[in-house]
Structures are given as structure tokens and as C-alpha cells.
Amino acid sequence: MHIKQIYGTAKWSYLSDPDEGFGSRKYHVVLEVPKNEATEHMADIKKIVGAEIVEQGKTTPNATTKFKEAPLPFIDNGETVDFKIHSQFKPKFFDRTGKALGEEVKIWKDSSMWITYKAQGYNKGMGIGCTLYIQSGQIDQLVTGNSQNCPYPNRDEVKPEVKQEIV
């Protein structure tokens, strides 16, 4: 069992309410991490997958084909790396001071956070891989709101600027 902590910015965030698409309820986040901070995590994940491949090799020593590998739980975008971390259960989150976030607080994309995750290797029909499970998290910069927020200003309160041109 490999438990690690990672810091990044949420690109997709279903941490306050579960994603109920495709008939399942899952809490998850895609965490964008700078490449220089992500390399250690990427190497650890590859080691876990490698250990699973070794175990599969022990159980099928006469296999002549390459073992099927599942997609890794991260995507290398060059300057940044996106980590896919999830949980079946609502993860516990804390603010910068260590106080638990209330149920009413909604964590939106662009929030920056530390997430403690457990990296777990697997060998299933889809292939050999690794899954990252959210254990808990701490918010650095919270971006929140509700679905009723309008991205536009109140036009009645905004006064148009009158510009005079000199000819």
C-alpha cells in the first residue's frame, strides 16, 4: 500500500457531490500538477504497475505475449501532468487551518489543494494497472459557488462609459 500526498489544481471536481453519470456514484478529481512536482508520483505508479506485471509473470511463467496494461491514472501534458484520483465514498476535506469543511461548501474546478491518495495496483480483465484512491484533502485556495451563479455582471449596475473622440 502506497499512501502519498500531492498538490495541484482541480481541472474537474466531483469532490462535494458525486458524479452520477453512467449509472454510478463516484467522487473524483482530475488534479493538474506541475511536471517537476509530478515526476516522483509518476515513477511510483509505474513501479506499482511493474510489480503487478512481475506477479503476473510468476503465475503464468510460460506466457509468450506481452501482458495487457490498463491506462495509467495520469496523463503527461508536457509542462503539467493530470492525475485521476477517485473514491466511492465522500472524502473528508479540510481548509488551510485544518478545520473540516462543512457539507454546504462546494469545491469547484480551479481550487488548489493537497490530496492524500492511496495507490493500489490491480490485475483485472482490462489489464494490469494502478488506481489512485482519495483518502482526504486540504484546500489551499477554494473556488466555490452554486449553479445559480451568473458569470455576467448586473447590467443595471454597470454604467456605460462615454468616450469622446476629438476630430
Please give the residue ranges for each predicted region.
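Residue-level detector of solvent-exposed, low-hydrophobicity positions
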Residues: Y14, D19-G21, K90, A100-L101, ...
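Residues that cap or initiate secondary-structure elements
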Residues: K35-T39, F89, N123, V143
